[in-house]
Amino acid sequence: MTWLLFRTSGALAILMVLILVHGELRIETKGQHGEDETAIQGRRRYKREWVKFAKPCREREDNSRRNPIAKITSDFQATQKITYRISGMGIDQPPFGIFVVDKNTGEINITAIVDREETPSFQITCHALNVLGQDVEKPLILTVKILDVNDNAPVFSQSIFMGEIEENSASNSLVMILNATDADEPNHLNSKIAFKIVSQEPAGTPMFLLSRHTGEVRTLTNSLDREQVSSYRLVVSGADKDGEGLSTQCECSIKVKDVNDNFPMFKESQYSAHIKENTLTSELLRFQVIDWDEEFTDNWLAVYFFTSGNEGNWFEIQTDPRTNEGILKVVKALDYEQLQSVQFSIAVKNKAEFHQSVISQYQVKSTPVTIQVVNVKEGIAFHPASKTFTVRKGISSKKLVNYVLGTYQAIDEDTNKAASYVKYVMGRNDGGLLFIDPKTAQIKFVRNIDRDSTFIVNKTITAEVLAIDENTGKTATGTIYVEVPGFNENCPTVVLEKKAICSSLRSVVVSARVPDNKYTGPYTFSLEEQSLKLPVVWSITTLNATSALLNAQQQLSPGEYTISLTVTDSQDRQCETPESLTLEVCQCDNRDICRSSNGNKDYERLDGKRPSGRLGSAAIGLLLLGLLLLLLAPLLLLTCDYGVGPIGGVTGGFIPVPDGSEGTIHQWGIEGAQPEDKEITNICVPPITTSGADFMENSEVCTNTYAGGTVVEGASGMELTTKLGAATGSGAAAGFGATAGFGAATGLGIGSAGQSGTMRTRHSTGGTNKDYGEGAISMNFLDSYFSQKAFACAEEDDVQEANDCLLIYDNEGMGAPSSPVGSLGCCSFIADELDDSFLDSLGPKFKKLAEISLGIDDEAKQSQPLSKASLSGMESCGYSLEVQQPESVRGQTLLGSQGASALSASSSVLQSATSIPNPVQHGSYMVTETYSASGSLVQPTTTVLEPLLTQNVTVTERVICPISNVSGNLQTPMELRGSRNMICTEDPCSRLI
């Protein structure tokens, strides 16, 4: 049964092949009248090949009368239902809806007018589909061609074509090519364009020829002349269908280019002018020419030249580019005595070469020019304008001073003789080497020439000489050239074979070395003349061509010797200066090594070499260690606190340097907190013995009288001096002195609270001894300052009342018109707004200070009454103070927590108030004042200060400040107990600081 299955399958396969072979898709086309089939024979089998074209259609026409333009047919149509479908341009691609197909019959129809310029042809894809929509045939590509019609005119690429041609060009020379296009079908009669010239401007003889089909514009003749017609305008037409169809016009602008075909000609046949002799001018004459070529071109621009007569090069001709004129210049002065008139000829040509068409016709035509020279009175001049001098060979460059070169005189051009009344000076004189005699014009050297002088160029020195006419002031300039020989040129250098020799040797070899090999020996060595005073006489013997042996006639002792040698070559040339050689002679050891003169172990070999040394490893290590320390130092600086650590201790930061200001203003170091009020210990006053002697404790007080004055000196160097009833003294703990003379008594003492000492009084008749200690302030400055201030205050007190201090008024309100503060009443309207009740009193801290300043301390009045004959101080430390007064004395003692004392005496001479001097130094202040009513010499009181454990305050010169701790005594000397003396402070009008 198996073979039956294979037989059935084979029969079915053969049947399918037969169906496929006999089935086909055919295209039928009808003629114009639909009667016969064209393009493809009907019902012919093409073996599955499709026809690729259909009936053509004409553009811009209604082609519907030709429908159907094609018909497609499939062979499967006989056995099954076939549906036809088309696609492509004109169907489902732009332009849409041009073609349609009958899906049952396969007829293709055109439904719209087409444009060939937009779509030259259409490609239509044809499909044959079964009922399932599947292709039963391979798709067929159908081409529909569109026939062209002449519907487009030619188009030129430019509306105006520009061209140019040189004048005198040969005929048939190409000028330009015109270009036009047609949108109709290429290579068709509809797109074939023909050109022709419609018109020419300027009208006349046709000058150009236009090719009909190529559009080339050529010259018709060779007679184009730019000077006659510089440009042409052509109107050109282009028509399709070889000139029978549509046409278009354009313009052609043709410029005729200029060529140098015209010769320039002088406007005048001859020219003449005149000029004064010895003068120059930039425009003596202008020449005009005529040239017909195009202006401001090289064909028009003239070039002037001399044909004869300007052999002396007196004249030049320059062309003016704006006018094309020739400008005659005089560049070299004319001499009337030599030339009374100058005649020359000129010619002209163009800058550009002449055109080949006329170059054979050009001939040089000369135009004569005559220049008359006018005679004028001439001055001086150098003839010749330059002169050369030569320095003779063999002279040294170091011996040129006063070397005479020669003379160079100016001449009078009217007489051609040496000019008179002329002064000569040097003009250009580089380096100031030369000098000319003002009268004789003799030139000589005034300086020697350095070996490397930059003023010598090519062995020549150039300078200028000026001759000044003393009558007219005119100047003539001449140039001189000084030729100098080659100084030191290739001069040999003499060297010693050894720089040092032993004292046992008496000879050394010298050699000559030449920088240039071509100057070789033999050389002759000779010694300069030697003085008889020299310790050693030398001689020299020639060894060979370049060496000699230098011998000493006597025994050499250690030291340096200088020998002068002269070297002469084979041509008798020698150096300008002798060569100076330095030879060292020294003591040598058994190894012939020269020992140095300093006695150390430094040796120098006789060959000039020193023992070599090297840097050891230890030295290298030290260098590296030093570098590391330098690098470590900045790092250590970064660890410093710069004073920001806590107060005290190791890291307490920087400690401020004491400046002495702590005694005046206490530095609390805080803001806002009130200072602590402390009591000040009273000043201790030593008692007085019954015998009148001073009781002292290690005070070292001694007295000496001189001229009624007193010197008060501290242990540290403080010194106060008073004399003739008026004194001012000041001193600092560091040590200084001040002295003042006649006038009111004022005193100032300054001392640091941190120092102590004993003040002693010395009285002498010869002078005052001043002991100064170490101090940070200039003693001379302080001495001068306080002395001047004391004199000024004293003189001021003598001539005016003391009204320039702080005055106290009973009433300072509005009712007191003389009150200096009466105007303060204007501020009474703010009394309600500001609480100024705190101004009614000074408070507990300043109350004592005010009592001390005003002298109203009640406690002092009650503690110690004042008697007529003596004044006793307070007794706080077991001491007392007594002062003998022969007359009535009114005094007060002020005691308080501040421990201050003040004494005053009544006198008609004293003023009520004292001017306020400015304090200049912080510290303790003390005033000692002495006055005598009888006029006799009265010695002042003595004040001795010794340190205590507490601070004390003395009010002086209106300044309250702490002074040094006091533990001494205050005592009036015995010599002053019979006089009127007082110890006082300034007026209560003092200011507080």
Curated annotation (Swiss-Prot):
Keywords: Calcium, Cell adhesion, Cell junction, Cell membrane, Cleavage on pair of basic residues, Cytoplasm, Glycoprotein, Membrane, Metal-binding, Repeat, Signal, Tight junction, Transmembrane, Transmembrane helix
Membrane topology: Single-pass type I membrane protein
Residue ranges of the propeptide: 24-48
A single GO molecular function term of this UniProt record: protein dimerization activity
Cellular compartments annotated: Cell membrane; Cell junction, Desmosome; Cytoplasm; Cell junction, Tight junction
Sequence ranges on the Extracellular membrane side: 49-617
Residues of this chain annotated as glycosylated in UniProt: N109, N179, N458, N544
UniProt keyword Iron-sulfur, yes or no: no
A Pfam family assignment: CADH_Y-type_LIR
Stretches assigned to the Cytoplasmic side: 639-993
Subunit structure: Homodimer. Part of a complex that contains DSG3, PKP1, YAP1 and YWHAG; the complex is required for localization of DSG3 and YAP1 to the cell membrane in keratinocytes. Interacts with PKP2. Interacts with CTNND1; the interaction facilitates DSG3 localization and retention at cell-cell junctions. Interacts with CDH1; the interaction is required for CDH1 localization to developing adherens junctions. Interacts with RAC1; the interaction is required for DSG3 translocation to cell-cell junctions, organization of cortical F-actin bundles and actin anchoring at cell-cell junctions.
Protein name: Desmoglein-3
